[in-house]
Amino acid sequence: MPELPEVEVVRRGLAAHVTGRTISAVRVHHPRAVRRHEAGPADLTARLLDSVITGTGRRGKYLWLTLGDGSAVVVHLGMSGQMLLGPVRNENHLRIAVLLDDGTALSFVDQRTFGGWMLADLVTVDGSDVPAPVAHIARDPLDPLFDRAAVVNVLRRKHSEIKRQLLDQTVVSGIGNIYADESLWRAKINGARLASGVSKAKLAELLDAATDVMTDALAQGGTSFDSLYVNVNGESGYFDRSLDAYGREGEPCRRCGAIMRRDKFMNRSSFYCPRCQPRPRV
């Protein structure tokens, strides 16, 4: 699933091309793509037609297009959603097609159909306007108003695994399995440690590591392991070449040379160095 850097790459690409444009045509090709919009495809189409896109926004893994009437198109990419500008190469997975007043085609393509669009009102939360369905999502480490000290205090009160807390979007958003493992590796913390047992200084270091690794990933267009994640031009990111932990089971740690390991975690996997990131004693 795309994480913060991948979604931000898409947001930036959209911002440069759709801001200020008017929607002149909309077609929903698959009803599942708008299943979160309770009023249905016809309502979404009617409300989008002739709307002006006034900007783009993102919090964590959620992306949205703000409209002139004060509402927003909330986009969740799911496992394989793509927001593409220009002609679509494979229309088999085209779910929503939008035509802008300058002739630009904006398409939502989703092979697995886990993602989707919905319309929602904007609400003000802690001084920022966000779509109502996103109001419960915490700020992410790249948000200018991200409060590291406050998040550290929240984590210190959590008597559960630190990696589980990194993935909790109500604590800190935007971090998924890949960047959680990368952040934990950089901070030399095993994800199985209890958050409450990690010092405030070390938790601050971990959040700084998350900020740094996602900034690095953003600079390289995000992480693409297959063709499912691409930017608005259909191009893959290449941060997968720079990963230090994720997917490196059986390879030497880039820092100490120990052989990287993989453990099962929440129907996923955790990758770590047994020397730099020793598991907590039971």
Swiss-Prot record:
Enzymatic reactions: Hydrolysis of DNA containing ring-opened 7-methylguanine residues, releasing 2,6-diamino-4-hydroxy-5-(N-methyl)formamidopyrimidine; 2'-deoxyribonucleotide-(2'-deoxyribose 5'-phosphate)-2'-deoxyribonucleotide-DNA = a 3'-end 2'-deoxyribonucleotide-(2,3-dehydro-2,3-deoxyribose 5'-phosphate)-DNA + a 5'-end 5'-phospho-2'-deoxyribonucleoside-DNA + H(+)
The record's free-text note on cofactor binding: Binds 1 zinc ion per subunit.
Entries under HAMAP family matching the protein: Fapy_DNA_glycosyl
Residues binding DNA: H93, R112, K158
Gene3D superfamilies the UniProt entry points to: 1.10.8.50, MutM-like, N-terminal
PROSITE patterns, alphabetized: FPG_CAT, ZF_FPG_1, ZF_FPG_2
The protein's assembly and partners: Monomer.
Record SUPFAM superfamilies: Glucocorticoid receptor-like (DNA-binding domain), N-terminal domain of MutM-like DNA repair proteins, S13-like H2TH domain
Zinc finger (FPG-type): 244-278
A GO molecular-function descriptor: zinc ion binding
GO biological process: base-excision repair
Keywords: DNA damage, DNA repair, DNA-binding, Glycosidase, Hydrolase, Lyase, Metal-binding, Multifunctional enzyme, Zinc, Zinc-finger
Name assigned to this protein: Formamidopyrimidine-DNA glycosylase
